[in-house]
Amino acid sequence: MNDFRHLSRDEQKLLADVALLVKDDDQEFNYEMLKVAAPDEASGEFWFRMAEMLSTLPPNQSLDLRMTGGRLAVAVSILSVLLQESPDIPQLWAQKVIALNYLAHGHRTRALGLAQQPDKAAEANEEEYLAKALSQNLFSTLKDALERFPEDSWFIEMRDDAWQHFGSEQAV
């Protein structure tokens, strides 16, 4: 477990609450509210740790695919802001890649499942659109990460994996 003693008490408490929400796989909760509940002077590490927790799968391995208020979408949002401020930290890029990878794969899988049901064609198309948009974001993020860290084997492997799963027409 991470040592958060150097964070403020308010930051520690909120991170403990986040950990419980993730552990319990609460997919009714609007995780955007955590940003509002954060201390006014929250540290960059606090925000990274929150995004890291939100992009970690709960014990039941369930993906929260909600694009508004969902765990993974909020993690991507937080990490996007952090990357604007600190683009030279590879862990930020990696965590964003992880969250986007989960979202893109989850929506692609949902689209394929819905496509098997004739009465769900519209929903399948919507999910496929989301999967494509998320995979494009994933490729763009990997491209930017590899421009900064061209020799990083993890980013290279993730790019190759994304290429294999989402098609070479979008790959970096």
Question: Can you say where each PLM-predicted feature lies in the sequence?
Answer:
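Short intrinsically disordered terminal tails
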Residues: 1-2, 170-172
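Amphipathic alpha-helical repeat scaffolds of TPR domains
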Residues: 4-19, 39-63, 88-128, 153-165
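Helix-turn-helix repeat elements of alpha-solenoid scaffolds
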Residues: 18-32, 64-78, 130-139
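Residue-level detector of the short coil/turn that links helix A to helix B
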Residues: 25, 70, 104-106, 167
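Conserved positions within tetratricopeptide repeat
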Residues: 31, 69, 76, 93, ...
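Canonical positions in the second alpha-helix
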Residues: 36-37, 81-82, 118, 145
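Eukaryote-skewed repeat-based solenoidal scaffolds used as protein-protein interaction platforms
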Residues: 82, 125-128, 140-147, 151-157
